[in-house]
Amino acid sequence: MIATSDLAKEYGARVLFADVSLQLNAGSRYGLVGANGSGKTTFLKVLAGDEEASAGTVTIPKRARVGVLRQDRFLDDAQIILDLAMRGDAVVWSALGEQRRLMEATGEVDAGRLADLEDVIAAHDGYTLEARASEVLEGLAIPTALHRSPLATLSGGFKLRVLLAQVLVGGVDVLLLDEPTNHLDILTIRWLEKFLGGYAGCAVIISHDQRFLDNVTSHTLDVDYGTITLLSGGYSTAMRSSVDLPSPLGPMIATRSPRRTVSDTSVSTRFWP
């Protein structure tokens, strides 16, 4: 699902990571761990295309949809909470919006275009989008009574829950989540664990919550010593199987995995010199 080849990121003389070649697969959830400042968020940004690497490539299937939870993104306070969550499925949201505008327009209706939009909506289970968005919002403890209220109704922490809901509602193939448990209580964390446990795509998750990583992730990516090491198992399993070297989340260094590559003519690859 995501392949990196000889990926590197440097800031001047400082090397965050180099020569990183990984294959991250659908159906797997990867916990991204390491010291503060080690390059976890930078690696996530490179995967998302938000930041350029210094060298190497990132390859993702062209039709794959990617959802990213960023810590530095904010939503419009004037927007309706439910609408913001529904916008997470950009394909359906756009099709529903165009369908509504065509049907409300005066004059002759473009029946062909309406039929095309109907096909798009049906193919993406679009008529359940509102119900799915409501379910995710409720799972994140945003009550139904507030779903049609402006975002400004909520406190800062709950606004971030709406942002998380938007990413989860999208039905994407790849989830890149930077600290998704921030501002969540124990009940909503448990709900998120269950949601991610049933997620069929490829997920890469940054979190300082060890229990959350144990409950959710199937693999661990350790950012340390200028490289990124792929380990089998969640946080605790990876820790037990690793060499006993110091790390802020525990001893997480192991022998680097052999380089893996991917070849697929239907992929989108970003190259850096």
Please give the residue ranges for each predicted region.
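ABC ATP-binding cassette signature C-motif
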Residues: M1-M239
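Residue-level marker of motif borders
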Residues: G31, S247-P248
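Low-acidity, Ser/Thr- and Arg-rich intrinsically disordered low-complexity segments
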Residues: S236, R240-S242, S247, R256-W272
